[in-house]
Amino acid sequence: MSKKILIITPSWIGDCVMTQPLYRRLHELHPGCTIDAFAPKWSMAVFERMPEINRVIENPFGHGALELKKRWRIGRELGKEGYDQVIVLPGSLKSAIIALATGIKQRTGYVGESRYFLLNDIRKLDKAALPLMVDRYTALAHPTQADFNGHSDNPCFTIDPESRQAALAKHGLATDKPILAFCPGAEYGPAKRWPARHFAELGRRYLAEGWQVWLFGSQKDFEIADEINQLSDGLCTNLCGKTNLPEAIDLLSCADTVVCNDSGLMHLAAALDRKLVAVYGSSSPDHTPPLSQKAKIVSLNLDCSPCFKRECPLGHTDCLNKLTPDRVQKAAEELARSA
């Protein structure tokens, strides 16, 4: 009888993308297994693009919400589904409470927030041995970290052509001209955001060559995207806050080149196999790089970076302000030539 596995997923979009190689490895180790994902509503579309996932179940809890009684009740309901194993990917105590409530015999995950009494297949994370987040996830497919070969596949999403065409029609877009996609937001803070004026300068160059420039992001990113558009003579298409996540994924898959900050959309673009230039400032690609053979990372590698701060502690954000559009354009052109 095939194994049935429940995954309690991370919340952040980028982290969700990086879990896909785990599911592929589970299928390799347990042929014919069934994998269901228990995921927040805002990230469900990510798992729906993964052929390894059988079913996506909505996790109703937001960031920081405890709601202990509700967690226990939902865990008990999940336990009726006949799972053989639950793998808890977040390191939080509250995520493991749900796993305990399910009564599933094998409850797998890292120690995290001292979860010794909640999980019974508990792993101690050797961060030095597994610096990449994707490998930390994939290693959980194996009985021990020592059994993991140290290699994870890259995420790779599926796209439904009809769904993509519907998204294009809904937003009045066409693919008759090459598309440059900008993802100018970064949820963590301004120290991860390349300046609007740099995005705009790069956009103007591509617009002059007959390209389209589409701007992607949430409603929170609308203001910076609008600034980029205004600095580009209003010739860009600002999609920030106008698409839901499934539409954003479909439309991003149309892009010929993507330029973005270290963000969830960066990981989506990588999983969609787009030519991708990832701009790094306060963060580091050593832990969560774009997982794609078509990605180039651009960073000044200043002595003060990565600082991992939301805002520049020195007040200048030179790591991004001094990273010129020329550098990013050169990386994009190198990708185009290698295609």
Where on the chain are the PLM-derived regions?
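Catalytic machinery of carbohydrate-active enzymes
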Residues: 1-339
